[in-house]
């Protein structure tokens, strides 16, 4: 299975490299990339050029920031890469569990969105997700032993 990973980066060369290398450890899922490099001055361009992955690189001038960079990357992906089964939006500093997508592969389904829980370096949950109940009331969800599916 091929997944198009989409992210914006700025001056986090080593974190970006580590994130991409962790994704590369999956055996049954291949990742290609659309990346907005928003004016990095730390050698990110050179590092990305040396990576052994298929990368569409969009260069910004430092004024896109994360939100506009992601918009530009998503619009590019929709126009140039409409044939991918899955798009994955990520941050440039995400530390993926090695092989996690191989484990998640049986859960992939057409027309579904998957959201992974986020943990800090200390292993504590920092974000899982929320489900709106009514009005402004919601219930928080963290990483659980059992999968949670919402309609």
Say what each PLM segment does.
Residues 101-114:
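Conserved donor-nucleotide/metal-binding helix-loop-beta segment in metal-dependent transferases, i.e.
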Residues 37-46:
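A conserved acidic beta->alpha catalytic loop
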Residues 1-22:
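N-proximal low-complexity "stem/linker" segments adjacent to membrane-targeting elements
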Residues 21-31:
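Short, acidic, metal-binding catalytic loop of nucleotide-sugar glycosyltransferases
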Residues 60-78:
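Glycine-rich, basic loop-to-helix element that forms the pyrophosphate-binding segment
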Residues 130-151:
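Short, flexible, basic/aromatic active-site loop/helix in glycosyltransferases
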Residues 84-95:
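Short beta-strand-to-loop acidic/aromatic patch adjacent to the donor-nucleotide binding site
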Residues 115-130:
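Short beta-strand-to-loop element that shapes/binds the nucleotide-sugar donor at the catalytic cleft/hinge
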């Amino acid at each position: 299975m091929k997944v198009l990973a989409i992210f914006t980066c700025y001056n986090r060369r080593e974190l970006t490299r580590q994130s991409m290398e962790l994704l590369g450890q999956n055996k049954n899922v291949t990742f290609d990339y659309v990346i907005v490099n928003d004016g990095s001055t730390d050698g990110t361009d050179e590092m990305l050029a040396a990576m052994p992955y298929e990368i569409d690189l969009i260069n910004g001038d430092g004024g896109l920031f994360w939100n506009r960079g992601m918009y530009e990357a998503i619009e590019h992906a929709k126009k140039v890469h409409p044939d991918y089964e899955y798009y994955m939006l990520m941050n440039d500093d995400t530390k993926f569990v090695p092989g996690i997508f191989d484990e998640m592969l049986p859960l992939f389904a057409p027309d579904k969105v998957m959201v992974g829980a986020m943990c800090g370096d200390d292993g504590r949950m920092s974000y899982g997700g929320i489900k709106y109940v009514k009005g402004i009331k919601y219930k928080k969800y963290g990483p659980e032993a059992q999968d949670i599916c919402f309609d």
